Amino acid sequence: MPSFTQPHSAPRNFQFPGQQRQGDPTMGTINAELADKGFLVTSTDELITWARTGSLMWMTFGLACCAIEMMQMSMPRYDIERFGVAPRASPRQSDLMIVAGTLCNKMAPALRKVYDQMPEPRYVISMGSCANGGGYYHYSYSVVRGCDRVVPVDIYVPGCPPTAEALLYGILLLQRKIRRNGSIER
């Protein structure tokens, strides 16, 4: 029987649900007795959190040139779906929004409306200098100086425009943050 406690192909920082409690002597005994029978003992919250990190559904909110790099991330060279992140077109089916580009004052209510349509728990990645703080157009009268003034942002990806690798790293950081917090609600 394969052992579920020691995965052979998992990355170094990967943890199956329940591994956070391996130091507990009671859980260690139960896990040891059931591991050779093909069972995994965990809590519901740990299982949901583990599943959530591997099934992020993202939607684009591309406003400028950063959106090109965001599209490149889902192409075969980087293949973001191998990390458990798949694109969705509807905000009602996605739990991650990537804001890429310059957010102007007229577009801010639309961003908030789309964010409010997303189901909980929902996450936001701010991609690029313009989305992070206004960027090149920071002093313009019509530009919002960062999308965090409209929606709460979880991860900031710097650059003008940031590379697809930087966005991919930001998504991996978000997965690590979800795994570390381990909460269903924000």
Swiss-Prot record:
* Keyword check for Magnesium: no
Which positions does UniProt annotate for [4Fe-4S] cluster binding? C65, C66, C130, C160
Alphabetically list the UniProt keywords: 4Fe-4S, Cell inner membrane, Cell membrane, Iron, Iron-sulfur, Membrane, Metal-binding, NAD, Quinone, Translocase, Transport, Ubiquinone
Cofactor requirement: [4Fe-4S] cluster
Q: What is its EC number?
A: 7.1.1.-
Q: InterPro entries attached here?
A: NADH_UbQ_OxRdtase-like_20kDa (IPR006137), NADH_UQ_OxRdtase_20Kd_su (IPR006138)
Location(s) in or outside the cell: Cell inner membrane
Q: Which cysteines are joined by disulfide bonds?
A: none
Coiled coil spans: none
- Name one molecular function that GO assigns to this entry: 4 iron, 4 sulfur cluster binding
In the record's cofactor note, how is the cofactor described as bound? Answer: Binds 1 [4Fe-4S] cluster.
**Region of interest (Disordered), ranges:** 1-27
The UniProt catalytic activity note for this protein reads: a quinone + NADH + 5 H(+)(in) = a quinol + NAD(+) + 4 H(+)(out)
What processes does the entry annotate via GO biological process terms? aerobic respiration; electron transport coupled proton transport
Gene3D superfamilies named in the record: 3.40.50.12280
Q: How does it sit in the membrane?
A: Peripheral membrane protein
Record Pfam families: Oxidored_q6 (PF01058)
N-terminal signal peptide: none
**A GO CC annotation given for this chain:** plasma membrane
Q: How does it assemble?
A: NDH-1 is composed of 14 different subunits. Subunits NuoB, C, D, E, F, and G constitute the peripheral sector of the complex.
Q: Give the UniProt family note.
A: Belongs to the complex I 20 kDa subunit family.
Instruction: Provide the function of this protein.
Output: NDH-1 shuttles electrons from NADH, via FMN and iron-sulfur (Fe-S) centers, to quinones in the respiratory chain. The immediate electron acceptor for the enzyme in this species is believed to be ubiquinone. Couples the redox reaction to proton translocation (for every two electrons transferred, four hydrogen ions are translocated across the cytoplasmic membrane), and thus conserves the redox energy in a proton gradient.
Name the record gives this protein = NADH-quinone oxidoreductase subunit B 2
Which species is this UniProt entry from? Rhizobium etli (strain ATCC 51251 / DSM 11541 / JCM 21823 / NBRC 15573 / CFN 42)
Gene of this entry: nuoB2
